[in-house]
Amino acid sequence: MYVHGFASSANSGTVTRIRTMLPSAIVVADDIPVDPHEGLAMLRSMVEREQPDLIIGTSMGGMYTEQLHGFDRILVNPALRIADTMGAHGMVGKQTFQNPRKDGVQEFIVTKAMVKEYRDVQEQCFADTSEAEQEHVWGLFGDEDPLVHTYPLFSEHYRHAIWFHGEHRMNDDIFLNSVIPVIRWIDDRQNKKERQVVFISIDALRDKNGGQQPSARKAFRQLLETYNLFIVAPSPNYSGDGCADVQSWLKDVISVPAYDHIIFANQPQLLLGDFLIQPSAVNPHGSFMGTVLELGSDTFKTWDDIMEYFPRLNGH
């Protein structure tokens, strides 16, 4: 189920995008009434009727989605303080719908009284942040969003708060590389699906100068479709700066898929998984119980060689 943003409709490009990129999914969406109390009531009725596996809300829709308790939800750049956003960005007075609506209405008026109504509705956010809800709610926040800045507020109440590279509006890159990974995590949990685990050394992704190894990000994204990936980095014994550097680099290069998938370990051979990808120059501390793929070796000179290996395992 998709919940659209301010001055939008169920006919938005995001609905088309979700249907195109997730062709097996049944996507439901509806035009939200301009009156916020009517809008919230309509959405609550809709979730009871549709019983969606997942709700995705963007911007103002993220504010509404937060209040649809009991369902798995992804809030993308949620305007959790929509009344403040409206006042700060000229969303008061005569407005034009950005997408066609079923009733054919093209314009609407936002009055000061209506802004107050939105403020009343936004104050209902965070009414239930119980342990059960913690696992239902994910927040994704664009690091270049010029309109909404609610990461601090969201993270005061929920633990799954994640930055992604992007601005306020959804596009193909944001949906593919930031939203779909979270959808995959939620879907795996709902279906109790256990993927094979691949540990990847940070030094297999990052070169000595701090840049990306050739084709590393492309390979990571391709592997992510099939495997549960974890990045392994050395754990500094006397300083936490090294951990912060790794987290910063992964946030910049890998982004959302690195969230909660970083392991700091000086004895990676003790990790329990199916595959370990590491540079061939690494001195082994012992025998990893799974399969070790050594990047830079005669067998796997490049990431492209590694990417030829995995499809063969599945008979492709």
Model feature map: region roles:
Residues 56-66:
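Gly/Ala-rich beta-loop-alpha elbow adjacent to hydrolase catalytic centers
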Residues 1-49:
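Active-site catalytic motif of lipid deacylating hydrolases and related acyltransferases
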Residues 53-57, 73-75, 137-143, 262-264, ...:
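Short, hydrophobic beta-strand segments that form beta-sheet elements in well-ordered domains
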Residues 207-231:
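Short, acidic loop-to-helix structural element flanking the phosphoryl-transfer center
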Residues 184-199, 316:
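Non-catalytic pre-domain segments flanking phosphatase-related domains
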Residues 192-212:
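Asp-based phosphoryl-transfer active-site loop
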Residues 240-316:
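C-terminal cap/substrate-recognition subdomain and adjoining C-terminal extension
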Residues 72-186:
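The alpha/beta-hydrolase serine catalytic core
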